[in-house]
């Protein structure tokens, strides 16, 4: 008879469930400014310590410290703060619109505004973002018309996508924002392919893509990294580790064993892990990765270490699977508050101006929502049926012609 122990299956479990005290002590958070910043041209094999630490710039006193400090101008910092506040104001008002029956679905970016806004500001015109549904800040930073967002969310007659997408699956090619897809694993593959095409044409444009940490368990993630590595695709591939894939905690995707940034090592590409609630740290990491991509040094995988402070969507109640006050205990704080405190520490901001800006942006959002409501909310106004046949085929084939005839169009 064997003395071997019986095999047992390991099932990862979160540290805290509803009713428990939130606990993030498992995460080692280094001091701001502690991590070295290597030169952009540094070979990948000399960068293998970076995925196991955390790039941080803003300390607890609101000061920007260390080698990753991008030394942004006060104007750039204020623009970043304003865009983050606009994103949050828009989220709050459109979330309420869902509760009022004006839209069928909505998803908020609460707690994750910093990385989308910073990365949108770093990338250049002509670069392409392959987004997930929590990077509304990218469009806000590019000046996308708020009323166009509202019209799509309300699914009304002026929906710029003519009812072809879910309310929050935006598409804005002219703003460097590729069509959002509910098939979240596809983002990396599309971005790598786009970046390879840019390199093949001898262009100077790069791609940036997002997936959530849960999606790293899908095959698309690994296939994209293989192509990115082999062909040195000029791309920045971001894993937004916000701790929760709907109700599945990050450990289900492997966070208990290693970092998501460390997954880059197997493919021979650099991996960075960045404080996703630190606007300056995200800016610096993205700038570094962008310089590598534009220098024909290939892709970089960035783990954006952050926290989803709201529910997954309007269809989700996070209190069913995590402590109700878990967001308050997140050790990296609120990205808006941290950037505000940095500006105050610089003498470039104060609480009065902050309150005035919040009120001003709320009025801007309110005006856009009213304009959309005048066109129509859910079920009150919708695109014409004939528009489902337009903008799809350059030349309609016989099936489309027959379908139009059957509908009397």
Question: What are these model-derived regions, one by one?
Answer:
Residues 46-48, 119-122, 228, 291-294:
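A general structural signal for short secondary-structure junctions and capping/turn motifs
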Residues 176-374:
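Glycine-rich ThDP/TPP pyrophosphate-binding loop and its adjacent helix/strand module
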Residues 1-115, 310, 319, 324-409:
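Conserved acidic/glycine
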């Amino acid at each position: 008879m064997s003395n071997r122990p019986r095999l047992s299956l390991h099932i990862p479990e979160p540290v805290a469930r509803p009713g428990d005290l939130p606990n993030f002590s498992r995460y080692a958070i280094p001091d701001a400014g502690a991590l070295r910043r290597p030169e952009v041209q540094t070979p990948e094999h000399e960068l293998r310590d970076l995925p196991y630490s955390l790039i941080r710039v803003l300390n607890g006193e609101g000061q920007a410290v260390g080698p990753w400090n991008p030394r942004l101008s006060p104007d750039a910092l204020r623009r970043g703060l304003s865009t983050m506040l606009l994103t949050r104001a828009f989220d709050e008002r459109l979330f309420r619109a869902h509760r009022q029956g004006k839209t069928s679905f909505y998803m908020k970016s609460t707690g994750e505004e910093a990385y989308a806004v910073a990365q949108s500001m770093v990338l250049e015109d002509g670069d392409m973002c392959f987004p997930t549904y929590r990077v509304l800040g990218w469009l806000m930073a590019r000046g996308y018309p708020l009323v166009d967002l509202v019209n799509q969310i309300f699914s009304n007659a002026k929906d710029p996508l003519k009812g072809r997408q879910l309310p929050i699956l935006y598409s804005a090619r002219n703003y460097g924002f590729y069509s959002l897809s509910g098939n979240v694993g596809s983002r990396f593959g599309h971005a790598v392919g786009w970046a390879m095409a840019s390199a093949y044409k001898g262009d100077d444009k790069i791609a940036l893509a997002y997936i959530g940490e849960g999606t790293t368990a899908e095959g698309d993630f690994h296939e994209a990294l293989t192509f990115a590595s082999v062909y040195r695709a000029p791309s920045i591939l971001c894993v937004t580790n916000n701790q929760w894939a709907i109700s599945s905690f990050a450990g289900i995707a492997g966070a208990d064993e290693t970092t998501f940034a460390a997954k880059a090592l197997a493919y021979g590409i650099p991996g960075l892990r960045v404080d996703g609630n630190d606007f300056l740290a995200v800016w610096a990491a993205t700038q570094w990765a962008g310089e590598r991509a534009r220098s024909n040094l290939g892709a970089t995988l960035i783990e954006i270490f952050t926290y989803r402070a709201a529910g997954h969507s309007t269809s989700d109640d996070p209190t069913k699977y995590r402590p109700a006050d878990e967001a308050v205990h997140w050790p990296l704080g609120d990205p808006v508050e941290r950037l505000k405190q940095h500006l105050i520490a610089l003498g470039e901001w104060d609480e009065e101006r902050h309150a005035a800006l919040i009120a001003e942006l709320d009025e801007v959002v309110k005006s856009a929502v009213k304009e959309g409501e005048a066109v129509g909310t859910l079920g009150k106004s919708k695109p014409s049926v004939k528009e489902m046949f337009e903008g799809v085929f350059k030349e309609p084939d016989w099936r489309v012609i027959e379908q139009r005839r059957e509908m009397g169009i």
